[in-house]
Amino acid sequence: MESTPKKAPRSKFPALLVVALALVALVFVIWRVDSAPSTNDAYASADTIDVVPEVSGRIVELAVTDNQAVKQGDLLFRIDPRPYEANLAKAEASLAALDKQIMLTQRSVDAQQFGADSVNATVEKARAAAKQATDTLRRTEPLLKEGFVSAEDVDRARTAQRAAEADLNAVLLQAQSAASAVSGVDALVAQRAAVEADIALTKLHLEMATVRAPFDGRVISLKTSVGQFASAMRPIFTLIDTRHWYVIANFRETDLKNIRSGTPATIRLMSDSGKTFEGKVDSIGYGVLPDDGGLVLGGLPKVSRSINWVRVAQRFPVKIMVDKPDPEMFRIGASAVANLEPQ
């Protein structure tokens, strides 16, 4: 009777290898999860501005519709320019009239200046005559005692000296009057500068009546139409700056140690989760509103915790700038998923 051969014992090496590989994979997954934070608590966002007119007036042209994309320099709306055109025409007419008045006044001033120069020459002549009369009197008076001149000669010298002084005072008054008349054109020149400033301001207001897009963007919250009276500094609609899109991703505070500015990120939007976008961390938030009713600071974002009956890690917003965003997919508030590369 033949005996059956015994089966060789199976090696345990393959099983141990599988277990080892599983442990390595588990360690890798744990490391990956710990060093490469990920969150689905994220949303797309972009900077916005309120489009406000800087002058008041009735809207006569509205060149955009709600949710329309615009390019930098595109016409948004136009305010009735007629009041500002009228103000400009009035100011320019005032300037023309003032220039004519200045021209006529300048002619008069030139004549007055000529008269003033003549009076100044007369003043010098009168001053010389008064000096001569005074010198003559000073020489004549001592001669009376010596008998070389008569008292009548001395009286005539005194009369001549007084007359010369009177003539000098008279021409000095004429010179002062002529000088004051010459300075009268300065006020008109100063008034012209004020009118020119008014013209410049009116031209600026007329330019502001036409409002154009300051950058590439998209119009939202448009709730007005042609004929509406627009008040200066009151918003007409909002304009999204579509040149730069970013994602606000709320990460647990325990993940922040692995996040820093410049960390590469992968972004997916809920509207099309099969498409990914690359980005980089721009900044990490340093303040959120607490849930326990503690100190509240205006302007801080509020990030709700997922469970409020268990002490869980707070979440802080991380701003991720998106490279080459799809303008048709990105919308403010769109749900997103953010995955950061391990650091």
Swiss-Prot record:
It comes from the Bacteria. Induction: Induced by LeuO, part of the mdtNO operon. InterPro entries: CusB-like_dom_1 (IPR043602), CusB_D23 (IPR032317), MFP_Efflux_Pump (IPR050393), MFP_proteobact (IPR005694). Pfam families: CusB_dom_1, HlyD_D23. The chain crosses the membrane at residues 13-33. Gene3D superfamilies: 2.40.30.170, 2.40.50.100, Helix hairpin bin. Keywords: Antibiotic resistance, Cell inner membrane, Cell membrane, Membrane, Signal-anchor, Transmembrane, Transmembrane helix, Transport. GO terms for cellular component: membrane; plasma membrane; transporter complex. It is found in: Cell inner membrane. One of its GO terms (biological process) is sulfathiazole transmembrane transport. One of its GO terms (molecular function) is transmembrane transporter activity. It is a single-pass type II membrane protein. Residues 1-12 are cytoplasmic. Residues 34-343 are periplasmic. Could be involved in resistance to puromycin, acriflavine and tetraphenylarsonium chloride. Belongs to the membrane fusion protein (MFP) (TC 8.A.1) family. NCBIfam families: 8a0101, PRK10476.1. Could be part of a tripartite efflux system composed of MdtN, MdtO and MdtP. This is Multidrug resistance protein MdtN. It comes from Escherichia coli (strain K12).
